[in-house]
């Protein structure tokens, strides 16, 4: 509890929201928190995000008038990110090397995201190749607490118009 507010943790979902009408498009959903609204229609996602932004603005502006121009959806619902940073780690303590996104609610556990729907297919192919390369060579990820290992992140950037790809292993 901090300054008049409390924080909690979700233990279990007993019933899906009526807004969750779609099947997940990702194999690691809902463990990964990268695209937690994917079971909602894109239209409902935009409505929900509009409410969230308006609540933040109303609170920050303390009743000051402003002109709301609305939320404008992207023409591309999936594979829209042109930059992504994936983490090296393990899915569980002392497990095999993984490369992907952090497990929802965890700063340590990493889930391999080889079918991530946020990035272009080229980037998921590179992620898979880099993961396999270091897995075969038994290269370990950097463990912050022990100050051992090497691999920290894989940064990928793709030029939308050129298709050029930057691969940066950290």
Residue spans of the language-model regions?
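Accessory RNA-recognition modules of RNA-modification enzymes
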Residues: 1-170
